[in-house]
Every structure is written in structure tokens, then in C-alpha cells.
Amino acid sequence: MGKEKPHINLVVIGHVVAGKSTTTGHLIYACGGIDKRTIERFEEGGQRIGKGSFKYAWVLAKMKAERERGITIDISLWKFETRKDFFTIIDAPGHRDFIKNMITGTSQADVAILVIASGAGEFEAGYSKNGQTREHALLANTLGVKQMIVCCNKMDDKSVNYSEARYKEIKNEMTSFLTKVGYAKVEERIPFIPISGFNGDNMIEHSANMPWYKGPTLLEALDNVHPPKRPVDKPLRLPLQDVYKIGGIGTVPVGRVETGVLKPGMTVTFAPVNVSTEVKSVEMHHESIPQALPGDNVGFNVNNVSVEDIHRGNVCGDAKNDPPCKTESDAQVIVMNHPSGIRPGYCPVVDCHTAHIACKFEKIMSEMDKRTGKVLRENPDIVKNGKSMMAQLVPSKPMCVETFSDYPPLGRFAVRDMRQTVAVGIIKSTVRAK
């Protein structure tokens, strides 16, 4: 039966100390993703190092540490199931490259849980100009995560004491902010749930501590999420993650189908190298499959192409149906974290799908209002943090990207410099590069 449930990708966002790990750990545990014995083992370890109060966060931290040390962990720990759906937590902001991952993402998130600390001064810190609450909410909307659930966490904090007035204050602030960022009909579409990620209030069952709250629990809100429509009817786009040479078989490119369908017998084109060939076979989890659909990570065997011809960052498409090609693009870019600001001529690295290529801001056409897209200045000489621009990007070597409106996963990117994400953007239009 289980196979019939829709799969939904979930991302958990919010300021550093909002309690994301505790909330996520508790949720996975409550939905049966982690057995009690594991929690108890972690809890003992936590108490030994004086962290007993972090038992659910400790679960995620331990999993993360084990992942970082290369110990394989049961990936089911990052999955849980509700009455209606299977959920996979695709990333949590504790990761160093969280913003880059969220953009170039191994997966597009279908829904975001925004965790907010309700404690006195804590909400204000996360919501301040330098806090991550704003940045993450803006990012989620820019990257097309249209469904959101807001958790007002730490309602059990002494400074809050399950206060309805504090909940309303935070809800009002955040409703107007999310509307500014670009979320529509926030009041109707985004649930605000007062919770305690540690004690479990309003996570699975309604809390006796907050009889004034009549809305859904976190679990009920997750069950109300609409499963995404996977784009099978679009032309094929498959960015390559790796290309292997396998003895006795030949060249095997590997990647995730983003749109369309990949089948044996198809003629495919790789961009920007403009190499075409026939697909001999398609495999997933070491088994031959008749077709690969969006979301599938696959390896496929191709005729007469060597590992020197195609590389990570190339894009595979259907030679007969809108094949991909090398492109230059105009993009809307939001500057997030640049020490001085971005000027024409700036040449950072752009991470778009699996491609990682230096691109020059050839021309900055305008500075715009982030939310409305209204032009504020034509041809600015510099665009600073928090501002949005329309820019012409020219890659230093051939690159294949697509417009965000046609192929979202190939149309959103991170701008990286000084080992951090300095800006994010979406491709508005492309032209075939000469």
C-alpha cells in the first residue's frame, strides 16, 4: 500500500536558535522515523555530555556528525510518513552550504516549515535585518517554494508561558512580512502553529496548554500540503552529476531527471557540447528500468561517446524535442551577502543545477523592487545587499541554463565568492550562445 502515497520534499528553515533541529527531530520521532531505543541511546549520550535537554536536536546532530564522518546512516531517519504522504527532509540549515544546496538543490522543496523562536527578544533577533528568518523566507519564495507552514516555537519558554498575546503579535508581524516577500493570501494559505518542539505541544496532538488555539497541529498542517505535479510532459532535462567509464559496458552518465522522460532507444543531445547519441539502457539502484521520470536518480549507457566528450554540469535532453543548447542569459539577481556590492564586470562563480562556472556580470540593466519587480534605477553602477537587479550574465566557458519559468531546476542559481553565497537569482530569458 505504502508505495501509493505521494512523496513530498520538505525543507526546515529559520534563524539559528529557533529550535529547528529539536522540532524536526521530534517530528521524525513522533512519526515513527526513529525508534525509541535510538532516542534513548542519544539521550544517554546527551546527558553524559550535559545536553539532556537537547534530546531531539541531538538525534539530528548525531546523524549529521555521522554523515560528515562518512559513516553510513539509515537514510530513513530523514524520512517520515503521515496518514496521507511520505515526507523527505531534504536539508536543514545547519549545513555549511545550506543556501547553495537550497538553490542548486539535489531536490526542489515542495513545502517549507519556517521555525520561529517566540521567546522574549528571540523572535526580534531572528527577524532583525541580520537575522536569518527574513533571508530564508525570501529565498524560499524566490526559489518557488509556494507552500509554507510557520511554527511559533518555544511557547513553553518562561518569557512566553503559552501566551496567546505573544502568538498574535508574532503572527501579525510575520503575516505582513510574508506578504511583502511575495506570498499571496497569507491569512488563508499559511498556517501559524504555536508549538513546543521539545515538549511536543501542538505537534501531533492539540495541547492542553493552549486551549485558545483552534487551528491545525503541525501533523495536520503537513497532511494538508498539496503534493507537487511532477513535470513529465515537459521535454527531457537531465543535468549530469558524473560520467563514469565502466569496463565491458562503456560510458555511463549519471544524474537526476528534472523534467520529461528518459527511455532506452531515445536519441539524446548533451549541451553545451552539442554531442548526440542513442541511449542503450537506463538503470536505477542497479536495476534496468523501462523509463526514468522526474525525481529519479539514474545512470544510463550511451553509444559512441567517451568520458572525454561529456562532463558534470552538461545537460542531457531529447534530440527531437526542444534539445538543450549553450546559452547566455538575463537574470534577476538578489544581492544577499556581498561586502561592498555588485558592479558591472564582476566575475564570481555561478552554481546552476550541477554546473559550476565563472560568469561575468556583463551589464546591469536595472535595480528593481524585490517584491513588485518595479524598476527603481536604470543602469546602476553598483547594487548593494538586500537589493534586486536585472543583469546580463556571460559565462567564461560554454554553459547550458534555462529560464526559470520553463525549467525551474535549471533556472535558479547561487552566486558564490569568498567561500559564501553572495547572491541568488533566477534566469528570466536566454539566448543561444554563438
From Swiss-Prot:
The keyword GTP-binding applies. Residues 5-232 form the tr-type G domain. One of its GO terms (molecular function) is GTP binding. SUPFAM superfamilies: EF-Tu/eEF-1alpha/eIF2-gamma C-terminal domain, P-loop containing nucleoside triphosphate hydrolases, Translation proteins. Residues 153-156 are annotated as: G4. GO terms for cellular component: cytoplasm. GTP binds at residues 14-21, 91-95, 153-156. Residues 14-21 are annotated as: G1. Signal peptide: none annotated. Residues 91-94 are annotated as: G3. Residues 196-198 are annotated as: G5. PROSITE patterns: G_TR_2. Residues 70-74 are annotated as: G2. Keywords: Cytoplasm, Elongation factor, GTP-binding, Nucleotide-binding, Protein biosynthesis. It is found in: Cytoplasm. This protein promotes the GTP-dependent binding of aminoacyl-tRNA to the A-site of ribosomes during protein biosynthesis. HAMAP family: EF_Tu_A. Belongs to the TRAFAC class translation factor GTPase superfamily. Classic translation factor GTPase family. EF-Tu/EF-1A subfamily. This is Elongation factor 1-alpha. It comes from Blastocystis hominis.
